[in-house]
Amino acid sequence: MRRAFTFAVLAALLLAGGAQSLTALEWGGTFDNTTTPPHYLGFQQEDTLALWLEAEFNPRMSLTVQGSYTYNLDRPYLFDVDILRFQGRFPLGDSSQMELSLGRFRVADFSKLLFDDNLDGAQLVWRSPRANLALNLGYLGLELQPVSTVSMTWGDLNNASIWAPPRLIEMLQVELPELFGRHSLSAALVAQQDLRSEDLQPEGPSAEVIGLGGRLSTEYLGVALRGPLAAALYYDLFGYLGTGRTLSYIDGAYSYEWVLSGLVGGGLRYFRGEWLSSSAELRLLLATGDEDYTDLFIEGNRDGLATVFSTISQPELALLFSPRLGNLMLAEASYSLKPAAVLQTLLKATFFLRPTLGPVSDARVDPASSSPYLGTEVDVAARLRLFSDLGLAFTAGVFLPGGAFRASDQETDFGGRAELSFSF
């Protein structure tokens, strides 16, 4: 089977005119299973089979392709192209290199909170001992909607198309490694444009229409600093300033109002390799909110300047309670260790609050509540790497809702997840 597949790939490359310069070819696959025990929606299971191919035409040119099939009860047939990346590497002197990538590939900002998803487009990277620069330009609307994590407006949420929201992304990131001592500085400029032109709520006087929404284009400027404070003690700090324009409903009329928002975070990490690779970490995160927003949260501005921070993709903050990163403050304490070479364990507690008494994206929060406390989640996880090509992971969590939740929704929440990964 493996020989037949390799022969078919070589034949395809020959027909394309590229086999004469092919110097290396590798292929393989992965099978991933995610199982969620009975919860709100009952027993859930998802299986993904992926096949990948890496072809090197010469030391400077390569092609990476990965396709996958995912099965679950909601979507029994989901075929996707995860990666389709043509990459060229061009040395610039003895210590620097330029890299150009075209196609579909994963892109993330330095925090992995603002944007972390696939991008169809181009990436230009310059690497040197003193500085690293990455410029990304791409389109999000060619990714399948079920696998996309991009969701910013009512139009994104109510998208009946199989395709992800039509948005254009530009991202420029600069890293200065070991700028002073062993401390590194990073900066990022990110912008996204909403290209949707139809089925939008027009500006002007109107009765309020729920669920239609408008366009949301945003820009972000971010900086980050990380490095050691002492032996085995490390820190990282970052912040984003966000702006843009969002559809707002004010005094019986729709209009686009300016956004001015912020996201700040940081952490301390203490690591001792000789103590079973023990790592203790404390992290803080704050995303601005707006008391003038309605309890629907999405495009909820009702009074002038909008100050809710909006991420482009939606990160997972915890196993059970993971609202949108807007009007949210959290403190996270975690401890991990490796009691065996094949076993990694983790204990994590996350405390959620809201910096303003405005709404958050979870509908269980009472808009009339004066409590800033959203709740506490405790998660435990174990990861087993039994063989180099076989891994298992088990996660369990409990969430205790806080005083900001409706009285009818303050029951303790339990949940778990089991994951299996096999490579071949």
Give residue ranges: language-model regions.
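Bacterial N-terminal signal peptides
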Residues: F7-G17
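Positively charged n-region of N-terminal signal peptides that target proteins for export
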Residues: M1-A4
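Outer-membrane beta-barrel "beta-signal"
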Residues: T412-F424
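C-terminal structural cap/anchor segments
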Residues: S279-E281, L286-Y373, E377
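Transmembrane beta-strand segments of Gram-negative outer membrane beta-barrel proteins
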Residues: Q20-D47, A55, P59-V65, L100, ...
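Membrane helical hairpin/interfacial module
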Residues: T64-Q87
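Signature for the C-terminal beta-barrel architecture of outer-membrane proteins
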Residues: E26, R60, L92-E99, D109, ...
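Hydrophobic, well-ordered secondary-structure elements that form the walls
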Residues: L282, Y335, V380-A382, A393-F394, ...
